[in-house]
């Protein structure tokens, strides 16, 4: 899946263009344009760096369509709305986990050289609502935070009219459960 983030003039409504592997293209609406890293890039980078295949971007690759997405071109699969709703219900907890992990890594990225103990403390505080058997290590979180800092710097240097393009190459792990047989 290819995802392109155009750098628009400040204060315009931002968006990205999502080209899924099935040929369907969506426009994903985001927040206001500016020099701050868009929220959707943050999630893409964090999920990619932590290998999260069942989060927001893995869900989009698998066929989830969020309310902030507009179909641009390409033949949508049959029953796309029902399939998307089922995927969102089935993977709701994993999407929440991806949101919280993104927030955690964004917080770590804002710190000046955080220690492993500081990352562990933040992890405990920010992920306390999750049931995660084993969260990523402080080293993995620190590496994801560094990648996020690099992307934030790239975005801040980008002038209106430029764009950042990403490849989502992680495997699709979201699967639609089979409906129960009716008797």
List the predicted regions and their residue ranges.
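Metalloprotease/metallohydrolase-associated module, dominated by Zn2+-dependent proteases
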Residues: 1-7, 11, 18, 25-28, ...
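Short active-site segment of divalent metal-dependent hydrolases/proteases
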Residues: 46
């Amino acid at each position: 899946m290819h995802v392109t983030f155009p750098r628009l003039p400040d204060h315009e409504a931002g968006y990205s263009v999502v080209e899924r592997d099935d040929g369907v293209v969506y426009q994903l609406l985001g927040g206001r344009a500016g020099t701050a890293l868009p929220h959707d890039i943050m999630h893409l980078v964090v999920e990619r760096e932590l290998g999260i295949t069942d989060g927001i971007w893995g869900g989009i690759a698998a066929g989830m369509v969020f309310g902030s997405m507009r179909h641009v071109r390409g033949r949508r699969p049959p029953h796309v709305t029902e399939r998307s709703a089922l995927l969102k219900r089935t993977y709701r907890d994993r999407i929440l986990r991806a949101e919280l992990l993104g927030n955690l890594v964004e917080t770590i990225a804002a710190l000046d050289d955080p220690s492993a103990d500081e990352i562990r403390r933040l992890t405990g505080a920010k992920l306390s609502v999750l049931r995660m058997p084993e969260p990523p290590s402080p080293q993995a979180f620190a590496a994801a935070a560094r990648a996020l800092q690099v992307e934030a710097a790239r975005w801040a240097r980008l002038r209106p009219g430029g764009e950042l393009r990403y490849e989502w190459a992680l495997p699709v792990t979201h699967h639609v459960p089979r409906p129960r047989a009716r008797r």
